[in-house]
């Protein structure tokens, strides 16, 4: 899948160590979001979307980009172009299919990634699909496509766009065992207030919808 045609012209700081930008993604007719972790003057990009050159320069003023981490092949986005732009490595899941270029490093669940990130296998959207957990301070979870912003809360991607919706819900349930106070999705703003409660509400809503007569 090629990059979105639009570029983000700026980014915002959820916290000093957590940057965010987004675009209206013409490929999927939905909003898409990207994140970056800043630690000790180094920046790790997560599923990066296109950034306009002034925004790239502003990003570099925050620190030195050192790596790109992908949660799955459906989130390649601008990874390969930014790899060349910054001269950094791309980390991608083992056995990810459909990658447009070869990643520098393949990762599996539980290994240490740059920036203190740890991959958590989160199948359902696809089989080779990962969340990234940052166990620093209050904790941050980058949940990729397991949960997305729907209206005022969290929800799930329509079942027809998932490999296995039941496994997606199970992945969401397993997130509740992790330590995090901020939840970051590939499609939506950060959830900074009681994100685990937001996950529980999404699961409860999905269960009610599943019981509703057709």
Task: Show the residue positions of the predicted features.
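Short, compositionally biased "basic patch" segments
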Residues: 1-35
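Alpha-helix capping/helix-boundary segments
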Residues: 75, 96-97, 190
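Metallo-beta-lactamase
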Residues: 2, 19-20, 25-26, 42-45, ...
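Residue-level marker for the onset of beta-strands and adjacent loop->beta junctions
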Residues: 7-8, 33, 107, 128-130
